[in-house]
Structure formats: structure tokens, C-alpha cells
UniProtKB/Swiss-Prot annotation:
The keyword Cytoplasm does not apply. The lineage of its organism: Archaea, Methanobacteriati, Methanobacteriota, Thermococci, Thermococcales. It comes from Thermococcus kodakarensis (strain ATCC BAA-918 / JCM 12380 / KOD1). Its cofactor is Zn(2+). This is Large ribosomal subunit protein eL42. InterPro entries: Ribosomal_eL44, Ribosomal_LSU_eL42, Ribosomal_zn-bd.
Length: 94
């Protein structure tokens, strides 16, 4: 899917329609020191199996896109609804 790099949309911070830059957010590595991750690692120790139901077969083939719209006037970014599923995504100049 081709999506424009700049789009004119409503800015909830300026409270008016302005030009926004569209940016695709990259997934960051998960923190190994978070409380949930430490609990999970403790659970994996020993002679046990996987502590949760196996997600194979239930997971979706494609993740949802995380798009941020950054206002060129105030510089703040916001999302617009939920993401959508798409295999190929490309930002293009219009």
C-alpha cells in the first residue's frame, strides 16, 4: 500500500487542520529488566514446559501498522484511530 508522506489532517493540540508528516514507528527491542519479563524468565527455569498456551495457528499473518502523524506547526505527534493490517507499506511523495 502506498501512503503519502505528508497529509493535511486535524491536529488535536492546535485544534485545527494542519499539514502533518506521516511516520511509521519501528518496533523497539523489549526490555529484559521489566517486572513481567523477569517473572516470565523465572517461570521458564527448571523442568517445565512453556507456561502459556502455544500461539501457533491463532496468530495473525500480519501485524497492525503503527502510524504517527507529526504536526508541522506545533511538532506534536498523534495517532489516528487504530492501525490497519497490510503486507507491504510504503511512504511516497505526492
Amino acid at each position: 500500500m502506498k501512503y503519502p508522506k505528508q497529509i493535511r489532517t486535524y491536529c488535536p493540540f492546535c485544534k485545527r487542520h494542519t499539514i502533518h508528516k506521516v511516520e511509521k514507528v519501528k518496533k523497539r527491542p523489549r526490555s529484559e529488566l521489566s517486572a513481567g519479563q523477569r517473572r516470565f524468565r523465572r517461570k521458564l527455569k527448571g523442568y517445565t514446559g512453556f507456561p502459556r498456551p502455544n500461539p501457533a495457528g491463532r496468530e495473525k499473518p500480519v501485524k497492525k501498522l503503527d502510524l504517527r502523524f507529526r504536526c508541522t506547526v506545533c511538532g506534536k505527534a498523534h495517532t489516528r484511530g487504530q492501525g490497519f493490517r497490510v503486507k507491504k507499506f510504503e511512504l511516497v511523495e505526492v
